[in-house]
């Protein structure tokens, strides 16, 4: 919400993930294009208190932002995986072995605890979003690698942190002047509640997001 108030149109995040596939190795970077939600009770919408909206979310990552992010990883000489499915778990505990094996059976590619809610809220705010999933470990499924520990994650994440900074710098330099994707109008056909039925308090609270559709001037 704060990003929207600041006028942000493009958003790229970076976070640690575990790999669920042999080919996604520690220190690789994945730019996922799909998510599976295994969280419980997290706030992941701006709506529901007097206004109902249902955004299209079949493709949760901005294709333009994803391409720019992937190209930027390659431009700094690092291994990038274009696309993949990120399973978002509740945490803060890591997976059990049974869960890790199940997600592999489901053909998930990486596992993390944060990015899905970011993607949902960014889409509702009509912000173009992509994430750099920094592989730090093989979760706990791999028989030839030790179980994930915080120490392991931090060590690999620190090594990837400098890479992420370089990549984000490249991303910013490659952003187009104007957006042509559908993200910028994600709410245009998503608002179900009649304009005159939206409470004045809600209209005011959500003015940065709904203003252009409800003819609200901030």
Residue ranges and their predicted role:
Residues 180-218:
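A short, charged, Gly/Pro-tolerant segment at domain boundaries
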Residues 72-109, 185, 192, 196:
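Active-site/ligand-binding-proximal alpha/beta "capping" segment
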Residues 113-150:
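Zn-dependent metallopeptidase/amidohydrolase metal-coordination segment
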Residues 49-93, 125:
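Histidine/lysine/aspartate-rich catalytic loop segments that bind and position anionic ligands
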Residues 140-188:
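His/Asp/Glu-rich mid-to-C-terminal helical/loop segments that flank catalytic regions of hydrolases
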Residues 1-58, 214-218:
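Metabolite-binding pocket within alpha/beta catalytic cores that recognizes anionic/polar moieties
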Residues 11-15, 31, 80-83, 87, ...:
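General beta-strand structural signal in soluble alpha/beta enzymes
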